[in-house]
């Protein structure tokens, strides 16, 4: 009976109460940022993704939550834009190619450099280790260690190992994002 009442309450909330959140998606080139946006928006995976030049903005609705996603290019010439697009968002999603171990140091340095910016203090960060379906890809424990995530103490930080191709852990990623649309009012 209680479950039925909860479902009815959720249904009423979905009709009368809409949530909006804004997030910025950053990370090195070829980590899978645009692919991630396409997977959460449409459920579709495409092998032949064109690298983002500059930025793309996309609105995605899941239930009663509309997520405005800023997908920022990861090439070196666009990294100076990351801070500007991260200001005032509900969350920063940092994408890592968990199978490209040669780029992990550069990725770690870029993440820590970004999070050192005073204007971004306190904004929650979700680190996604993409391409877990590839051989040698790091899991969450490996990512936390190699990206030195435990040293980040001034904000909430979460890390998931995902595969956009296989759609692994996309559901828990969306749950985290939706939870942060409700807990943050920026």
Curated annotation (Swiss-Prot):
Tissues showing expression: Expressed throughout development, from embryo to adult stage, in different tissues such as larval motor neurons, salivary glands, testis and ovaries (at protein level).
Key words of the record: Cell cycle, Cell division, Cell projection, Chromosome partition, GTP-binding, Lysosome, Membrane, Mitosis, Nucleotide-binding, Protein transport, Synapse, Transport
UniProt cross-references to InterPro entries, sorted A to Z: Arl8a/8b (IPR044154), P-loop_NTPase (IPR027417), Small_GTP-bd (IPR005225), Small_GTPase_ARF/SAR (IPR006689)
SUPFAM superfamilies (UniProt xref): P-loop containing nucleoside triphosphate hydrolases
GO CC, one annotated term: lysosomal membrane
Binding site for GTP: 29-35, 71-75, 130-133
Intramembrane parts of the chain: 1-19
Main localization of the protein described in the UniProt heading: membrane
Record has Nucleotide-binding as a keyword: yes
Inactivation phenotype: Lethal from late larval stages. In garland cells, results in defective late endosome-lysosome fusion and inability to form a rapidly exchanging terminal lysosomal network. In motor neurons, results in defective anterograde axonal long-range transport of lysosome-related vesicles which leads to defective protein localization to presynaptic active zone and synaptic vesicles. Fully mature presynaptic vesicles containing synaptic vesicle proteins (e.g. VGlut) and presynaptic active zone proteins (e.g. brp/Bruchpilot) accumulate in the soma of motor neurons.
Cleavable signal peptide: none
Amino-acid biosynthesis is among the record's keywords: no
GO molecular function annotation: alpha-tubulin binding; beta-tubulin binding; GDP binding; GTP binding; GTPase activity
CDD domains assigned: Arl10_like
Cell compartment(s), UniProt: Lysosome membrane; Synapse; Cell projection, Axon; Perikaryon
Swiss-Prot/TrEMBL GO biological process terms: anterograde axonal transport; autophagosome-lysosome fusion; axonal transport; cell division; late endosome to lysosome transport; lysosome localization; neurotransmitter secretion; presynapse assembly
One Pfam family it belongs to: Arf
NCBIfam families on file: small_GTP
Annotated function: Required for normal functioning of the late endocytic pathway including lysosome motility and late endosome-lysosome fusion. Not required for the delivery of lysosomal membrane protein-containing vesicles to late endosomes. In larval motor neurons, mediates the anterograde axonal long-range transport of presynaptic lysosome-related vesicles required for presynaptic biogenesis and synaptic function. Acts downstream of Rab2 during presynaptic precursor vesicle biogenesis. Essential role in chromosome segregation.
Protein name as it appears in the record: ADP-ribosylation factor-like protein 8
Organism: Drosophila melanogaster
């Amino acid at each position: 009976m209680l479950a039925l009442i909860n479902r009815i309450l959720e249904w009423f909330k979905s009709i009368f109460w809409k949530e909006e959140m804004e997030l910025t998606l950053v990370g090195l080139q070829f980590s899978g940022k645009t692919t991630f946006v396409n997977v959460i928006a449409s459920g579709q995976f495409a092998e032949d993704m064109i690298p983002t030049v500059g930025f793309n903005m996309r609105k995605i609705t899941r239930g009663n939550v509309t997520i405005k996603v800023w997908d920022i290019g990861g090439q070196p010439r666009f990294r100076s834009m990351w801070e500007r697009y991260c200001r005032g968002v509900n969350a920063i999603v940092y994408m890592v190619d968990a199978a490209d171990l040669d780029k992990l140091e550069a990725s770690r340095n870029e993440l820590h450099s970004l999070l050192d910016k005073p204007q971004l203090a306190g904004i929650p960060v979700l680190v996604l280790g993409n391409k877990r379906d590839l051989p040698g890809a790091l899991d969450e424990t490996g990512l936390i260690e190699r990206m030195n995530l435990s040293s980040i103490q001034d904000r909430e930080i979460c890390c998931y190992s995902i595969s956009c191709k296989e759609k692994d852990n996309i559901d828990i990623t969306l749950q985290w994002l939706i939870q942060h649309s409700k807990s943050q009012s920026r």
